[in-house]
Amino acid sequence: MGARNSVLRGKKADELEKIRLRPGGKKKYRLKHIVWAANELDRFGLAESLLESKEGCQKILTVLDPLVPTGSENLKSLFNTVCVIWCIHAEEKAKDTEEAKQKVQRHLVAETKTTEKMPSTSRPTAPPSGNGGNFPVQQVAGNYTHVPLSPRTLNAWVKLVEEKKFGAEVVPGFQALSEGCTPYDINQMLNCVGDHQAAMQIIREIINEEAADWDAQHPIPGPLPAGQLREPRGSDIAGTTSTVEEQIQWMFRPQNPVPVGSIYRRWIQIGLQKCVRMYNPTNILDIKQGPKEPFQSYVDRFYKSLRAEQTDPAVKNWMTQTLLVQNANPDCKLVLKGLGINPTLEEMLTACQGVGGPGQKARLMAEALKEAMAPAPIPFAAAQQRRTIKCWNCGKEGHSARQCRAPRRQGCWKCGKAGHIMAKCPERQAGFLGLGPWGKKPRNFPVAQIPQGLTPTAPPIDPVEDLLEKYMQQGKRQREQRERPYKEVTEDFLQLEKQETPCRETTEDLLHLNSLFGKDQ
């Protein structure tokens, strides 16, 4: 521990603790980072004493620099730490790790040239576009040579098949990875697929059918001279009866070249498209937007299913213009119909961006509540006859006394006097029952006229008492009539009938049931 701490001492240790781990970060380097770097050097067979000098750090960087692009996170962290230690030994001020790496790179380029490109190995790389053939076939000194596919390309193809499981993305992925390949390379890609052997068998059947069609359309011309290259058959294009050299010669011969690689790729694409339809049985007519599904998710599913459809581009265009709007949910369909005829996809996505979300539901709820809580419209005639409210406190119209903002009036609101309220005001009119509760008779009765020359010896009779006596006598007579038997009442009616004008039907007939039912009884 002590030896490792002796890598940086005094001012150098202080300089280390001022350098940040990341640009703009809070954490800074500590001595524990040097201890960790010394432990990691043992894994690469390097002595930890190399960290004590600038030259030693430069040797470490020379070893680690080629490994950084493909190295692990620990290797990259070790390289960064050594760069910081090198800057401290070289007295180069750095604020953070990135700045230290830049200074190390500039120094190595200027002095040791270690950051230049590593010398190319025996394996050729892809030529720039326009300078030669495609990547699997290279032109070296005027001759075409074959370069096998890299394991990385094969691994990418296998991962694509395993993850997408013959989705619509497999066909364009195969086209990108097999660009410029020979039938030999394409067969390598197909042989790397371990699972999905049912799909592989479908592809083999398609290859056999296409090879038979090729043989039928391109018959053998006849015997060829010795040393002349034969014409490819269907099995030659499939790579089963031809070598890589023959395939390259057919592809790049000066006269009548046959692109066997492109032809074989087209056969494979036909088989992959059949596999896509088999593994994705969903019809585009069944793609419909859910009631709560965002419009963008629905569009993604729609175009994914449309991509798997192997139809004419005109038919796909019709499906996009018709089915995309027709199969949307009612909320989005209402918005899309307002955009006019043939709107663009960008306009549809922008218009339906918030449809179906909580914000749109809240707006619809607010509009519904606003309509429900709105006052009912009053007809014009009823509005004209409507009485205006008058305040008892201030005497103004338009509000009630409960809503009045003026000071409260004291005393009775009717007469303005104190000592009572309006409900008990003596100046109020009498009700229809007569006198009020205070014992004062109403003043709207006519006064009896007294003849001239006569002086009454007694007080005049009150008209109210006379009317009350008359009503009492009339009620007494009605009670007596109700108590009399039926026979006496009938005799009274008969006597009244004899006194009056005779009519067609007598009272006795009226009292009999025959008056109701006629001759039926």
Curated annotation (Swiss-Prot):
Residues 191-228 are annotated as: Interaction with host PPIA/CYPA and NUP153. Residues 14-33 are annotated as: Interaction with membrane phosphatidylinositol 4,5-bisphosphate and RNA. Residues 12-19 are annotated as: Interaction with host AP3D1. InterPro entries: Gag_p24_C, Lentvrl_matrix_N, Matrix_HIV/RSV_N, Primate_lentivir_Gag_pol-like, Retrov_capsid_C, Retrov_capsid_N, Retrovr_matrix, Znf_CCHC. One of its GO terms (biological process) is viral translational frameshifting. Residues 8-43 are annotated as: Interaction with host CALM1. Keywords: AIDS, Capsid protein, Host cell membrane, Host cytoplasm, Host endosome, Host membrane, Host nucleus, Host-virus interaction, Lipoprotein, Membrane, Metal-binding, Myristate, Phosphoprotein, Repeat, RNA-binding, Viral budding, Viral budding via the host ESCRT complexes, Viral nucleoprotein, Viral release from host cell, Virion, Zinc, Zinc-finger. Signal peptide: none annotated. Gag-Pol polyprotein: Specific enzymatic cleavages by the viral protease yield mature proteins. Capsid protein p24 is phosphorylated possibly by host MAPK1; this phosphorylation is necessary for Pin1-mediated virion uncoating. A zinc finger (CCHC-type) spans 389-406, 410-427. Residues 219-226 are annotated as: PPIA/CYPA-binding loop. One of its GO terms (molecular function) is zinc ion binding. A motif (PTAP/PSAP motif) lies at residues 456-459. The record marks 135-136, 365-366, 382-383, 431-432, 445-446 as: Cleavage. GO terms for cellular component: host cell nucleus; host cell plasma membrane; host multivesicular body; membrane; viral nucleocapsid; virion membrane. SMART domains: ZnF_C2HC. Residues 112-138 are annotated as: Disordered. A motif (Nuclear localization signal) lies at residues 26-32. The keyword Disulfide bond does not apply. A lipid is attached at residue 2 (N-myristoyl glycine). Residues 279-365 are annotated as: Dimerization/Multimerization of capsid protein p24. PANTHER family: ENDOGENOUS RETROVIRUS GROUP K MEMBER 24 GAG POLYPROTEIN-RELATED, PTHR40389:SF4. Late-budding domains (L domains) are short sequence motifs essential for viral particle budding. They recruit proteins of the host ESCRT machinery (Endosomal Sorting Complex Required for Transport) or ESCRT-associated proteins. p6-gag contains one L domains: a PTAP/PSAP motif, which interacts with the UEV domain of TSG101. Belongs to the primate lentivirus group gag polyprotein family. This is Gag polyprotein. It comes from Human immunodeficiency virus type 2 subtype A (isolate ST) (HIV-2). The lineage of its organism: Viruses, Riboviria, Pararnavirae, Artverviricota, Revtraviricetes.
